[in-house]
Amino acid sequence: MARAPSPAKSISMAIVVIGGHSRSVGKTSVVAGLIAALPEYHWTALKITQYGHGVCSLNGESCHCATDDHSWAISEEKDRSGESDTSRFLIAGAVRALWVRTEQGRLAEAVPTIRLRLAESENAILESNSILKFVRPDLYLTVLDRATADFKRSAQEFLDQADAVILHAPKEDRPGWTGISLKPVASRPIFHIHPPEYVTKEIAEFVRMKVSSDLKPKA
């Protein structure tokens, strides 16, 4: 699948996207780990969540409001308690953390505002698979865990676009998922992790090298 067009951005800006094949595989921990390991990039961090029907995009709670009223929302995190994912981003060192909530299938409606937020950023790191339909990052990493059977369609769709794989060290020889081939990333770097460590020195250096090679000095 062809990559989405890149948003208008500063020539000295980098966009990193962290995806994964299911919930609870460590995407948020990888984002927070990279922010902490690479503070010199002054990250703006975005977490993108798509909800099912009957859940309000304004606050993530169940509701019966008109779909067109609350199809998406973006809020900026201010709390540093560490209780939410975006709060963890701030604690890790992000200069700004944003939570994007949309109804399933309606992410496109939030994209113009997302692009504006990206344009305001020095560098950006996003937690999402589906954003790849609309944004072309400088680097895309996917987090995989053989012990988790679920494999999102969005993760399958963009697997071949991953620049590298962050793979939980196998607890079993056979992956929990079925009907999924990792051939699209067979030639890509694979970094094994052992939680609670989600970002190794090798991962941080790989990201630094890739991001630095794409950055151009400011005019």
Features from the language model and the residues they span:
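Active-site rim loops that border cofactor/substrate pockets in soluble metabolic enzymes
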Residues: 72, 95-120
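N-terminal phosphate/diphosphate-binding loop that engages ATP/GTP or pyrophosphate donors
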Residues: 35-102
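Extreme N-terminal starter segment of soluble prokaryotic enzymes
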Residues: 11-16
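Conserved beta-strand elements of the Class I
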Residues: 17, 42-46, 142
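Conserved catalytic-core segment of NTP-binding enzymes
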Residues: 116-123, 128-210
